[in-house]
């Protein structure tokens, strides 16, 4: 079994096992395995065209995989139709019926054979109250804002009490302020109901703020599956490091010994043993902009780089300082770094463009990655 679908008792409520999906000669998904616990909120994150929506559609039964299987509640549903999978689905386009009022739209997915009209109306109103738009029950979709329509689509998906909720970029068509509000609302509703949820998004902030764990996909391959914190502080490869947050990469490096790296004329200390596998080999060193420190005194005498300030960008709560690394003996290298400083720190340091600025790269903040042959 793939390491990403193992846990203490070996069971997940939703499991995707070794899924491969082809469209002709194009591989949309390649041997992807993911496990989701009951009640967990998981985001699938990646750039456009990476295969994340294809994964959701395979889980939903809207696309048939070429190989692999989908398990829900310990049952193989790989060949089951959509109707037998007990899913609620919210699409990016909302897919509301324009000629049916809001309460009618929400009722639509509730089984007419199992529930009376009164029961269906009661359940629909309960869901509208949950999403906070019960006062709009008798209006039509065209009379509602985009954010309200998205909440109707969510209420409709939840009305039949699905075992799993699938969200396909549900917030991408909304403006930024509404997106931020609905992020919190969707998570509140999910936690209230305890429904297992999988959300597809290309927005990293959306994924990191909403999900318990995040699946990162690129070119149809699973790049990492971890908590938002783990993705940010311990990315497993350069793709995840670059895609999640902002990252500086120093490519012209070679392993020196188990605890240090050559960067041109500089020696960079790492955590003990971190460089063990890179001795004499090319390596990429990475560090977050907020982890770079300005040298204020002589108390630090290692991992110091000479730099020149090329540009200062104000970004509200912080400044981003664009730096160019200098050789120890003088002259500029081709290496550039971004450093983030809070406004208070920036004001106290009096940093200006074109000034030389010594910086410190803390060993515990340096990440090391294998450099692919032919790549910088």
Question: Where would I find each of the regions flagged by the language model?
Answer:
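Non-catalytic connector elements of ABC transporters
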Residues: 247, 256-376
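ABC ATPase nucleotide-binding domain helices that frame the ATP-binding cleft
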Residues: 53-56, 152
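Helix-to-loop junction immediately C-terminal to a conserved catalytic motif
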Residues: 60
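Conserved ABC transporter NBD signature motif
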Residues: 68-76
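ABC ATPase nucleotide-binding domains
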Residues: 41, 80-88, 92-239
